[in-house]
Amino acid sequence: MSSEMCPVCGLPSELCICEEVAKEQQRITVKVNRRRYGKEVTVVEGFDANEIDLHELSTYLKSKFACGGTVKGSAVELQGNHLSRMKAVLVKKGFSPEQIKD
C-alpha cells in the first residue's frame, strides 16, 4: 500500500473524515461590514484554519457568488453583500446549519 495515513485519525488519506467532522463542529459567524466609499464586504469567520482548507473554501465561495475575495487569518472575506444566500451555500458545502450564525 502506497497510501499515506492521516496524522489525526490514522485512516488512509482516501478514507479520512477529519475535515467532515471538523466542518460540523465549527461555530461560524456571517456578517456584512462597510468599507471605504460605502463598499460592503461579507465576512465569514469562526473557522479553525488547522482543520479546514480556507483557500479551497474561499475559491469555492468566490465561484458560487461570482465575486472577489480573500482569506485573512481565520476568516474569509467576500466583496459584496451575500448574507442572504451564505447559510444555504455553507450547509450545502457540509457545515452544520445549527452552528451558522447570521
UniProtKB/Swiss-Prot annotation:
Pfam families: SUI1. HAMAP family: SUI1. Belongs to the SUI1 family. One of its GO terms (molecular function) is translation initiation factor activity. The keyword Protein biosynthesis applies. Transmembrane segments: none annotated. GO terms for biological process: formation of translation preinitiation complex; regulation of translation; translation reinitiation. This is Protein translation factor SUI1 homolog. Signal peptide: none annotated. Gene3D superfamilies: SUI1-like domain (3.30.780.10). The keyword Protein biosynthesis applies. Keywords: Protein biosynthesis, Translation regulation.
